[in-house]
């Protein structure tokens, strides 16, 4: 049976490490259990977060038919989960895998980035991602205000530290202004951010087309993750 999480105690049993677990944990740290647009659920050892129409599933679910029906009932349009779990949801979802990469390169001792305003960050991000300002601003400002996420920039490039939890950090929304692409700006920013996060395992999720780029700047492949779309 899938039950809604109403208290942090209900998260006991959520693994301390792993991308899915940290995505759910960081989302709970930002929003808690009191919003209808951001909900958390549990089915034994399976944990689920639903933010608007996006879901994250962590752990094996005994009744995958129930879980699939539940996600459809919630009206989710995309699901992030372990690759091994994904086939249980296809159809009606279609599957598009991404790559989890871990930074293994030599970390510079120089910290050269700054913290941009949300508007400054968006001016860079909008050149690489199809995102609307208002929902992005509301979510990002909330995460930053609650100490869950942070932004970093160096004038030409920008990125988000989506979470920094239990010795693991995930970099996301990495973008460079068109006129500065191919000049090493993103690499310098990533190295600077990694230098500011000592003693962490630092990860990024990327599509196949960016594998070579991340390998060149010091990331190594860890595993495939599934993104399910509807």
Give residue spans per PLM region.
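Short amphipathic alpha-helix that is part of the acyltransferase structural core
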Residues: 1-25, 97-135
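Conserved donor-binding loop and adjoining core beta-sheet/short helix segment
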Residues: 2-5, 9, 15, 23-78, ...
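Acyl-donor-binding surface of acyltransferase catalytic domains
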Residues: 47, 52-113, 202, 206, ...
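Conserved acetyl-CoA-binding loop-helix of GNAT-fold acetyltransferases
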Residues: 63-70, 176-178, 182-196, 216
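Conserved active-site tyrosine of GNAT-family acetyltransferases
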Residues: 89-90, 213-219
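A mid-sequence, solvent-exposed acidic-amphipathic segment
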Residues: 119-175
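Recognition helices and adjacent regulatory flanks at domain boundaries
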Residues: 152, 162-164, 185-196, 205-207
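Helix-turn-helix
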Residues: 210
């Amino acid at each position: 049976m899938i039950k809604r999480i109403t208290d942090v105690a209900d998260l006991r049993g959520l693994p301390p490490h792993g991308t899915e677990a940290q995505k759910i944990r960081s989302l709970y740290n930002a929003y808690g259990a009191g919003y209808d647009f951001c909900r958390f659920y549990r089915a034994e050892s399976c944990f689920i977060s639903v933010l608007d129409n996006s879901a994250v599933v962590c752990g094996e679910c005994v009744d995958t038919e129930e879980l699939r029906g539940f996600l459809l009932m919630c009206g989710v349009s995309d699901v992030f989960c372990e690759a091994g779990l994904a086939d249980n949801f296809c159809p009606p979802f279609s599957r598009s895998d991404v790559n989890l990469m871990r930074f293994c390169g030599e970390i510079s001792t120089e910290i050269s980035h700054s913290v941009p305003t949300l508007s400054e960050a968006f001016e860079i991000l909008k050149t690489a991602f199809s995102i609307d300002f208002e929902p992005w601003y509301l979510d990002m400002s909330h995460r930053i205000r609650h100490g869950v996420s942070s932004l970093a920039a160096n004038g030409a490039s920008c990125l988000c530290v989506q979470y920094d939890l239990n010795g693991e950090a995930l970099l996301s929304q990495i973008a460079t202004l068109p006129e500065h692409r191919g000049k090493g700006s993103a690499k310098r920013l990533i190295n600077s951010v990694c230098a500011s996060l000592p003693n962490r395992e630092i990860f990024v999720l990327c599509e196949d087309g960016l594998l070579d780029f991340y390998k060149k700047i010091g990331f190594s492949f860890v595993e495939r993750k599934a993104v399910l779309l509807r």
